[in-house]
Amino acid sequence: MRIALLFCCLAASALAAPPLVRIDKATSPPDWALAERALLKAYADAAAEFTDRYIDSRNFFKCIERWGGNDGPDDVMETFNHWTLLYALGGAESFLEQYRRIWEGHLIQFTMARAPSTQMAANGMYYKEFPASFDWEHTGEGLQAFLFYALDAPADASYLQRVRRFAGFYMNEDPGAPNYDPKLKIIRSLHNGSRGPLLTPATVYDWGGEAVPGNPARHERYKDAANIRGDQPLNLGACSLGFDAYVLTGEKKYRDWLLEYAGAWRDRVMANGGNIPTNIGLDGTIGGEWGGRWYGGTFGWNFEPTGSGRNYYMRGARTGFGEAFLLTGDPSFVEPLRRQIANLYAVRQEKDGRILLPQKHGDQGWYGFTGNQYFEVQRDIYLWLMDPADLKWLGGDPWLRFLDGKNPGYPIRAMETDFEQIR
């Protein structure tokens, strides 16, 4: 969503002047446009009610502050993820006003909050207004509204100051946060942030925060997640900080870093036969912290080997490669995504008329076949490159069929679903 919207907002500057279109008579708006305005109003009303109920006089969220991947600081801000996007789409000023004060309160609340049993958040879950050190699955979730805010108020001085600082954590501009190895072009740990990379084994407390009486599962799910050394494709989510810093300031160093880091990942994927590796060792080799296994790694291809979930290889890759393509127009940044999708379909299974793709890979090969075909990634690839070859598996996509004039009722049906979510 974020990459697609930014393409729409920014790509026009790179195009030749379009033909003049004269609009000189009023027409009735289509039904979907009226429904969209009503939907934005309903969201605004719901947001105001939610703010009144769950934000206190300090602009703190009414909750028990916890650290970790179960219910950490990111989950608080996920509640407000779309508010800055809704404003950018034409929503009420109240979205922006509420977000601003909630964000400021959030930064104070979780800078004050402590997780004493952790290695990196014992003196504050946030440090310098940023997560002390955690994975980009969660850091990225907590920053979505912040990143979309660039579309709302690009000249906001405090935003510019923060986005420069946050991007600098990944460019070694802060000596206390040596997250990036510029020689090997890696982020040095799955846990990284304003206090730098965690290079020692991650404990269940580093992952799950303080123990909660009667809830042992809070830590059980992380008992096999100690090895976080080296780079992981989730870290490509950090490209969004460099992207926002570059498009708002024009400073070349941010663009250079993003393209260097995303380019290194592109080259690794292509050298690995088009499969996205889920660990790059501290020596720069594929699978270097997992015995040379490209599919090793926490939140990687072989994580939790008895199931089909919690393999987050695609999330950062989709973001980082998409932003690199947006900045350059170089299709080589899209090719790793294309190749990965092709590799999955090459080993597909079919059951009861359904296509199943592998979600996991281990010593035994591909496994964990499910119906997840990564249509959202395939849709991005097609919309970025507009190559009909990328429509091979997307024939039934409702949005693309609408754009092709074959699914006129889609917008109303989609918004009906949104109205139900609000209710």
Give the positions of each predicted feature.
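Glycan-recognition and catalytic cores of secretory/periplasmic carbohydrate-active enzymes
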Residues: 16-423
